[in-house]
Amino acid sequence: MIRIFNHYVSKMAFILLLLELLMLLASASVASALWFSDGHGHFRADNLYLSSLTFALVIIFSMSALGMYQHSSREGLRTTLIRIMPSFALGFALLSALIAVRPDLYFGRGISILIFAIGATGVVITRLVVFKSAESALLEARLLFVGGGALAHECIELASNKYGFHQSHVIGCIPLPGEEYCVPDALLLPMGESLLAMARKYEASEIVVTVANRRSAAFPVRQLLECALGGVRVIDAATFFEREACQIRMDSLQPSYLIFGGGFDQSFIRAATKRTFDLVASGLITLLTVPAMLAAAAILLEDGAPVFYRQERVGRDGRIFKVLKFRSMRKDAERAGTPTWASQNDPRITRVGRIMRKLRIDELPQMVNVFKGEMSFVGPRPERDFFVRQLERDIPYYGVRHGIKPGITGLAQVRYKYGASVEDAIEKLQYDLYYVKNNSLFLDLLILVDTVQVVLSGKGSR
């Protein structure tokens, strides 16, 4: 894994994206050389480089939006072909819309077909080569765990079930004396002469410390320091979860980690960058989704007025504001007078509302809240004060998520299902804490792309 602007990214996925970007850029030049190889004709695009860059970026965006950089690195030819076809179809639709606005980007019909054919072929070949390389043991992270308790069990499960381009190999666990074991016996390793000697023996690339009580006399402080000085990376469980799951886990969190763990950028430059991103992204989304907003008039036909729904939510620093949404539930949804979480197949949701929720159309009016500065485009979802007071009482550090503005979309929304319980709130909080700690323009852009994938797939709606 590599860290870009505080966010962990799979090294293999990053390399694949760069290779495919270069290949797509080259495909336009190759297609042009082949098309005009007889010396006749001319290139219709006024700027070959700008047109090629536009083509490459749109295709990369389309593949990202359909999850092409998130899935298993061991896909075969058939699966690769199946997944690439809709990506290029989406790219074709987006390019057609761009060309309608900027005709000078048009390559010409014949050469465009050739560019798409060369580009798609190049992507397939690139992926097959990279997928094959990803199976090499040389590219695996070899993990040695110190501790064999419940925390070690959770870390090992995460490492073992990790999919995508980042592969891990669990060497085993070295439990401390007197520690209760929660890991399989097959993974238990006896302590050798020293941790450093064992790390070198098993060729460990990293040692993960999963010991909850670090004040114990059995905690091997000197040996861990020896490993760090010997060139073996040593991290704790909190850092491991943050890197591998994009979560700050509550079960491994210590207050000192939030205070001294870095991140939490609230500088003027970050605030100005985020505000600019909010205005630009919200403006573009508003323009692109005007037809969808007009379609929400179907609410009137099914259930009458009002079309819009205003509700008090908790914003930054606990301030209350009124969020604006398209109404997706019956007008008497809370006739009992008590706020209630939406449930699976909630009968209060109207037929039109169910479609709007699936496509996230009901969230679009919140652009008004973004323009007013009450919300950001990306951030933790704002909750109702009734639920916030309950969750702050039941969940430690829940109030930390209110350190930044809430968002229309967020890391928890693209990584986790729709939440409707305290347990779900804890899971989502772990993603929210990660975002609050590591938020950046780069992470906002990644979440924006992932949001497109969520909308297209209809995941997480109720």
Residue ranges and their predicted role:
Residues 1-138, 274, 462:
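Signature of alpha-helical transmembrane segments in polytopic membrane proteins
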Residues 386, 393-462:
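C-terminal terminal-structure detector
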Residues 84-88, 139-158, 306-329, 351:
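Membrane-cytosol interface motif
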Residues 33, 128, 132-136, 158, ...:
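Membrane-spanning helices that line or support transport/gating and their immediate boundary helices
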Residues 342-405, 447-455:
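A short, structured surface patch at a secondary-structure boundary
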Residues 1-23, 27, 74-76, 125-287, ...:
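N-terminal hydrophobic signal-anchor/signal peptide
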Residues 269-332, 369, 446-462:
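A hydrophobic, helix-centered structural microdomain
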Residues 179-181, 238-242, 247-251, 309-348, ...:
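Short, glycine-rich, amphipathic interfacial segments at transmembrane boundaries or analogous
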